[in-house]
Amino acid sequence: MKIKDAVNMIRWEYREKIDDYVIIIIDRLTENGLKEISFSELDAVDNNYLYLKSEENTVIPLHRVLMIKRKSDNALIWKR
């Protein structure tokens, strides 16, 4: 399954529990090199980027996405 398909599946099939899902990305500015982004922060996804709801209009390239997890039970939904 492609990243875009996994993101869209969660956004549409689990929208009532969207806060329970996070996207883990590579982030060079953090100490451990990883950053968690809640699905509630996600505005859109296309074939190349994730677009976040923010004043800075943050755009994240999909090649930085490592995995998608469910927080409640730490289940791995998708992994590169």
UniProtKB/Swiss-Prot annotation:
<dbReference type="InterPro" id="IPR040459">
    <property type="entry name" value="MJ1316"/>
</dbReference>
<protein>
    <recommendedName>
        <fullName>UPF0248 protein LS215_2790</fullName>
    </recommendedName>
</protein>
<dbReference type="InterPro" id="IPR007547">
    <property type="entry name" value="UPF0248"/>
</dbReference>
<comment type="similarity">
    <text>Belongs to the UPF0248 family.</text>
</comment>
<dbReference type="Pfam" id="PF04457">
    <property type="entry name" value="MJ1316"/>
</dbReference>
